[in-house]
Amino acid sequence: MHPDLGPLWKLLYVLVILCSSVSSDLATYFISEPLSAVQKLGRPVVLHCSAKPVTARISWLHNGKRLDRNTEQIKIHRGTLTILSLNPSLSGCYQCVANNSVGAVVSGPATVSADALADFDSSTMHVITAEKKNTGFIGCRVPESNPKAEVRYKIRGKWLMYSTGNYIILPSGNLQILNVSSKDKGSYKCAAYNPVTSELKVEPAGRKLLVSRPSSDGFHILHPALSQALAVLPHSPVTLECVVSGVPASQVYWLKDGQDCLSGSNWRRLYSHLATASIDPADSGNYSCVVGNNSSGDVKHVTYTVNVLEHASISKGLHDQKVSLGATVRFTCEVHGNPAPNRTWFHNAQPIRPSSRHLTEGSVLKITGVIMEDSGLYQCMADNGIGFMQSTGRLQIEQDSGQRPVIVTAPANVEVTDGDFVTLSCNATGEPVPVIHWYGRHGLITSHPSQVLRSKSRKSHLFRPGDLDPEPVYLIMSQAGSSSLSIQAVTREHAGKYTCEAVNKHGSTQSEAFLTVVPFETNTKAEPVTPSEASQNDERDPRDGSESGLLNLFPVKVHSGGVELPAEKNASVPDAPNILSPPQTHMPDTYTLVWRTGRDGGMPINAYFVKYRKLDDGSGAVGSWHTVRVPGSESELHLTELEPSSLYEVLMVARSAVGEGQPAMLTFRTSKEKMASSKNTQASFPPVGIPKRPVTSEASNSNFGVVLTDSSRHSGVPEAPDRPTISMASETSVYVTWIPRANGGSPITAFKVEYKRMKSSDWLVAAEDIPPSKLSVEVRSLEPGSIYKFRVIVINHYGESFRSSASRPYQVAGFPNRFSNRPITGPHIAYTEAVSDTQIMLKWTYIPSSNNNTPIQGFYIYYRPTDSDNDSDYKRDVVEGSKQWHTIGHLQPETSYDIKMQCFNEGGESEFSNVMICETKVKRVPGASEYPMKELSTPPSSSGNGGNVGPATSPARSSDMLYLIVGCVLGVMVLILLVFIALCLWKSRQQSAIQKYDPPGYLYQGSEINGQMVEYTTLSGTARINGSVHGGFLSKGSLSNGCSHLHHKGPNGVNGILNGTINGGLYSAHTSSLTRTCVEFEHPHHLVNGGAVYTAVPQMDPLECINCRNCRNNNRCFTKTNSPLPVVPVVASYPQDGLEMKPLGVMKFPVCPVSTVPDGGQIPEECLKDSVAPAPTQRTCRQDNTSDINSDSTEDTAEFNRGDSSGHSEAEDKVFSWSPLILSPVLEDCSEKTAWSPPGPPLDGLSVVLQQAQET
């Protein structure tokens, strides 16, 4: 039977309660704190933190701000913080906070950073010479790396990982070669290896080592060339390097502060170097490497200044204290370190800021008038950059009866006119009765009891010479639980926030009120001082024995005579001038500042002071101020020597005898610099007095983010500020920064920021009532993955300004929902192009549906030289998920690269894409022309989501346009060539048809005379020429139509080769018309021996040859429309090789150029006479003008006899074919017909036959 365990369980329960109550009363302390980490982007990071007692709750801080458990990409579970995917926004300082009912403590900072390995400096290959059997030195400038890179060397294609043999890799990364030999010559390349990312980068150029014969040049210190200063951590290994050539290592000596440093120390010799395994702070000092012989005086040395750093430490820390309410507490924290550490105080894990009750004096924190809220845990943290230390102390406060203050009547917001009197009241209750304090924008407001109210005059404070910024005068009247703050003669400087704080030993409470000061619109006279006010003015505190206190509080303008002028007594400082100049100038280096005078305050304006400086709206940097003094009578100032396309800020104030007024502010932008060859004309200025209200649409605004307001409108409303710039504050918040412009003559009272989410048409207020001193505001609670635009509004007493131009779209990092699935399919690289000798541009496509529409966060672009076979040589660029193209920079000229991609999100990376190979361009020669490349831009995704990436819509490149132009030109040329070929073919076919149906002449097959043939052909024009033919077919004139027939006569010895010259026939330039005469060659012996005449005959016009159809020579006429008569080429259409022209006997063939003949067919008798005189009564064959050609024939004959060289050269190369033909001349008007002998008579009897024919 089991015993009853009821009482035992009750006892155990009571013990647990007691233990928990005891543990809850224990102060919290850390068992383990987070450690710094270096990790690759996109990889997870885990931080651990644990504290005692076990009831302590753990929370985390990032860069001093508390992390929410629902923060994207961060997972918090008890004392473990996990960064799921490291990105730049998550890098920084992390601290854990442990708290319980006693208080809270904060851990030391742990830095989380992304790995980094910079590139080697691009340099040319250096040639190094080392002497044989001596020491060689290869220098290496190791690039920056996080963490520190490991140095390796590639020697003649082989890797050297560690010091081996005669190769020593020094801690500085340099390489020392001992006992150099011929086999050591070759190429040496230094490499840096990042142990976190396993990334290896090799020096691009390297060194080339040449080995020479030993020489007697003496000894040299190769490294270091100059004295060095080292700062090292304590207890770390240190090597002081000294590479010497020309002497053995035994002749190298090391001295510390002039004494031998090897005896009795931890230092040892390592070849010619000095090394220690653990250095101590006592080892700090000057170390010298001495080489040479002191006796001979030939000594060389180099010095190291070693500074051993010390971690921060606390020699005297905090201890627990227990005090009563209202007491004063002091915590002491003495720190040491090298360099001197910074000391930071914390109360319950919150930094302590100095106040009236919390004061820091050296190593002491002093708290006066402690209250219950001051109880808890206090920490002193010392940090000097190489280490931190902390000490914790607990403050307990004894409780007694009482009540914390409660404000029952809070001060109200007040709006008053400039110069009026205002009073703010505040009442509070508590036990004990609380004390009430007032705070303004300058801190705690104090008031001496002697201060009294002044008259309610509407004027500003008058300044004495030398008083630049007098403190505003206030009057505080307080009693138990009640207080009032009075301000007389309110000015614009008094506007702002006022805080009422009620404090007793149990705590404090606060209430706020805003004071708004509006300008006084009308001129008023000085109000008289009433007797009561005068009596108040004469009141003095007995403790104040002089009037100096009042004079300091109410300074006045003191003149040389010592009497204040009445006009000055009622005058005030002038108002801000109204700037009329536009915010943009058409000139690149000058600007005309034009203004209008504001109210002068009752005194004339003596001068204007204009200050201007350049602003860099891209980086926020500003230039130095330039100040110009302008006489008060002027209203215009020309600013010169400005920079083109730059933004400038102008501040302008008016000064009178009373003082300087409120400043007017303006920002303007200069225009672009115009090139000398530009043909663009400058836009004309608009006519004065005809204002044009610009369109303030976001789409059409192109004024560099400036909204141009109407220059003729001077209602006092400020101008719209410049386009705001957006920068990331955290994952879900941004900083909106802007630059204000002219204030419209009235001070700016507030700013307002609006935002709009893309795909939404509503503008919402992000922040309002922003003080005018702030030009930046943080907008929180933005939705991850969304795209926003922002704009700014300026407010003064006259109202709101125009809205500024909307900012450029800003996409918040992350996604609305978490996606744990990583993408599988990567992007596809569609195009690569080398845009310069160091840049390659690539485009890609990504189809979300290939990964089930899983959104992606961005792309990884990997690239390495093609000749590399090591995956660690790949470099990586990270690109946003909305991009569709990227330009890889910092590449080597004329080098081929392998390029591949991945897409990634929070779940991981996708598979690799296709690999593209692209080679950079040849390095441009200095001085060669270089054409700017058009900027490629990809419009943001319309969805605002990095995963929904559509096809690229970037504009066409200039190279594509060049290809298009060349293709069009070639196409037009090919088209013209095809048309030309078609025309040639058509022309050829036309000529073939013409030659087929309209031959140049028809040959009649006559009788053979002793085996010889006589050729006849028609002729358009002939002349009486001794042995030559004149008026050939190649003359410039048009050949006359007709039926004229020419009978050729050939002398003995004429063969088939034309050895003579045809003058005036084939190539004659004469133009002639032939007469209708009977022409006969009666002097055949004048022809050149061995020559022959051949003349082409044009066709006859159909109208002239109607009657030729009855001619008995069977010649035919064909119709030819509107074209010159064809000519027969010199060479016959059908040449026959070996054809010989037989000589004929002397014959006379009378020719009668007629169209018709009688039926009898007989030739008239006059046509057969030896005389060649034409018959005047003869009927002609055509109605042409007749002309005597005897003179022409004479000239041509003479020309022929001279032997024209040109005609001769043409004819010599021609072989003429003579077709056998005998033409029977038919004469229209001849009554007789010549009887021809039948073929068959011998050649010798030819003359007899012809003679008989003549006799008949």
UniProtKB/Swiss-Prot annotation:
Disulfide bonds join C49-C96, C140-C190, C242-C289, C333-C380, C426-C500. It comes from the Eukaryota. Changing I787A: Fails to support induction of the Sonic hedgehog/SSH receptors PTCH1 and GLI1. The mutant protein retains some residual activity during overexpression. The mutant protein interacts with SHH, but does not interact with GAS1. GO terms for cellular component: cell surface; plasma membrane. Changing V777E: Fails to support induction of the Sonic hedgehog/SSH receptors PTCH1 and GLI1. The mutant protein retains some residual activity during overexpression. The mutant protein interacts with SHH, but does not interact with PTCH1. It is a single-pass membrane protein. This is Cell adhesion molecule-related/down-regulated by oncogenes. It comes from Rattus norvegicus.
